[in-house]
Structures are given as C-alpha cells and as structure tokens.
C-alpha cells in the first residue's frame, strides 16, 4: 500500500481573534502574495505578519509581502482595512499615512498550487494563472484585522474516517485471505 496523492483543502477555517494589528485573516477566497527569495511570487493564507529590522511587512518566515509595504519608524498604530489598504499613524501625527495595499490573488484551481513549505505555494500549470485583485472584489474575500485563520480540519471527523477506512481494509484483507484458503482447498481435491 502506498500513497498515490494528497490533496489540499483551502476551504476557510474559523477565525480566531488575536488583537494583534499585524494579524489578518482572509474571510473568503484568495491568497496573500509574498516575494520569494528567487524573485517569484508565492501565495499564502497565513496572515500572521510582522515588521522586520528594515521596517518591511513580512510573513512569519521573514518573506516580504508583495507591493513592498514599509512601516515607518515611530509608528504608533497600523490599520489594515477590509479592502487591504494599509495605513499607519506615526508619532506626532493625527492623520493616518497610507502605506500601500496588500496584494491578493485567486486561482481557478487552488488545489493545483504547488506547495513549497511554510504555508507557501507557487502557481503551477494545474492551478492556472493567478487572478489578482482587491480584497472584497471579483470573488476575493475581504480582510479581517486582528484575526488569524485556524485550521479547517475537524480532527474528530478525520479520525472517524480513518478508523472506517482501516476497518474496510481489514475486511477486504480477510475476504481475500478466505478466498485464497478456499482456492487452496479446492486445488487439493
């Protein structure tokens, strides 16, 4: 017995509130775009962003978000709106300063994305071309600041399915074994 394939399930998980202004969850379809070290674009639903030493908005693994959003020094608060617009209030100012927009894409077949590790994916022939857009438009989900998306796996349901599969395998194995024994006895006659 060997694994033939594994599939990715990109249905939305529940949102858990973190109260961290740099955490964002996608409510609906879509992926955040990030700049990969090789210069290509990667895609993720993991919105646990942080600010690196250069002030860039980066993923938890240190990859900068596409569109090069930089948080100025002295920022007292960051706001990420439902449509992906990022703004900051810098010390000494009362008006928010626009910093850019989070880039998002969707795919005709997101199950065809190529996994590259650390919750990152690359486009492939199976996924189709990325369809970029503004969060909340053209079928893309909107953004919720201060939330992260939790797993979409129901552990209990998956455990029950695994046990059912194991039982079915055992029954088929017994049936084959019994059939083999019957053929052996028949050939002895």
What label would you give each PLM region?
Residues 1-189:
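Amphipathic alpha-helical polymerization modules
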């Amino acid at each position: 017995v060997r694994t033939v394939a594994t599939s990715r399930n990109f249905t939305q998980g529940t949102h858990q509130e973190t109260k961290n202004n740099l955490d964002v969850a996608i409510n609906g379809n879509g992926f955040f775009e990030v700049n990969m070290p090789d210069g290509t674009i990667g895609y993720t639903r993991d919105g646990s962003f942080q600010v690196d030493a250069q002030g860039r908005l980066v993923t938890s693994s240190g990859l900068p978000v596409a569109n090069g959003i930089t948080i100025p020094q002295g920022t007292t608060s960051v706001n990420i709106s439902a449509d992906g617009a990022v703004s900051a209030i810098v010390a000494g100012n009362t008006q928010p300063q626009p910093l850019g927009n989070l880039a998002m894409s969707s795919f005709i077949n997101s199950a065809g994305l190529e996994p590259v590790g650390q919750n990152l994916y690359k486009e492939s022939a199976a996924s189709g071309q990325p369809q970029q857009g503004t969060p909340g438009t053209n079928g893309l989900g909107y953004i919720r600041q201060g939330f992260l998306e939790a797993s979409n796996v129901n552990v209990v349901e998956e455990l029950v399915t695994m046990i059912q599969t194991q039982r079915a395998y055992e029954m088929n194995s017994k049936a084959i074994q019994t059939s083999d024994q019957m053929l052996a006895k028949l050939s002895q006659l």
